[in-house]
Amino acid sequence: MSESYDVVVVGGGLLGCLTAWMAARDGARVLLVDKDQVNQHASGQNAGSLHFQLEYRMVEAGEEAARVAAEAMPLHLDAAAMWARLEDEIGESLGVRQTGGLMVAENADQVGMLEFKAELERSWGLDVRTLDRSELDTVAPYLSRDIVAANLSALEGKADARIAAPAVARAAVAAGAAVCARTRLTGASHTPTGWDVTLRETDRTGEVRTRTVRTAAVVIAAGVWTTELGQVFGAGLPTVPLALTMTVTSKVPAFIPHLVQHAGARLSLKQSLDKTVLIGGGWPARLMRDADGAPEFDRKHQLIPRSIAGNARAAVNAVPSLERVPAVRSWVGTTTVAPDQLPLVGAVKGAPGVFVATGGSAFTLGPSFARVLTGLLAGRSPDIDLAPYDPARFTEGSTP
């Protein structure tokens, strides 16, 4: 067997590219594979939010659910610090701007939720303060007069999802990693020194070549394909795939410096460096499924007109001047969450040398996920308690 590596990273999104880059910097022999192209799927389709406050999906189910979701806050804080220096370390622009993020409220119930959320986040070390209407007049005059308060985190912001992962992939190659696109991992067998993995590569002419690669370790950084890849290694990695709606407007003079989210609605919006406004926040799209109801991730998922309209209404309600800005395009992005909304990060039970990271905010938390995984690959003890994110926590007999 001619090909051998210290680690094979599966998934060419931001997380996979970061892991390949960091591991290669550590001196590991790294192969990064993606069944399609680098940045083709979730990392390149998302809206590029860097949201370190708890999102609406994490608090809409109530205070207890929010407390559980807040257990990921050490990863949020770590990622916020890493994003602040990532462009300098990579040596390229990733479109990062951490100019602050607002979660806005329109009524007393939502303000009460903001106060609870801010207290919870501060207990974990995230600096969040609540702004009243008069303060918002100065900080965010573009907001609707219906907005009566907001939580502000100075760490939040945005990155450019179109360029971030490709830039990191180039840095990984410069550090010595090999990158193979159009290459699907289809099988694995355990060996005394790690794994022999079967790779199926399709070249640009459609010709298929299958080869086996020996590796000491495998990292699953494959988003919605996590559960499928776990099965290749005989492991149960339960995830819930989601198809979500995004919309981009035409260019408009810069007027929104913040990431904006809502305490009572599915909304995130921010103005990109090219002056378009990106609108998202969790409005569903139609995830394509087969006749048995199983998701088919290789098919093109479908937009739902009422989601596009609902998302646009939420955006205009928060920022009224957007009503005069034409929408240019809407598209579907995918993500995956765990049943308890916390990420899966760490070693895969029953599959020695296999590691995984995934869960809801993998773009935002990608730098932290990758740093943790790279440390585990190198045998370093993690400086973040990974117990709440244990991939085995849903396995029968495991203690959450």
Q: Which functions belong to the PLM regions below?
A:
Residues 49-135, 266, 306:
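Dinucleotide-binding Rossmann-like beta1-alpha1 core, especially the glycine-rich loop
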Residues 7-32:
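N-terminal Rossmann-like FAD-binding beta1-loop-alpha1 element of flavoenzymes
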Residues 39-40, 209-211, 215-257:
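Central helical "cap/lid" subdomain
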Residues 92-103, 117, 124, 128-175, ...:
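Helix-loop-beta segment of a Rossmann-like dinucleotide-binding subdomain
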Residues 253-351:
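Active-site lid/adjacent beta-loop-alpha segment flanking the redox-cofactor pocket in flavoenzymes
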Residues 25-46:
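Glycine-rich FAD pyrophosphate-binding loop
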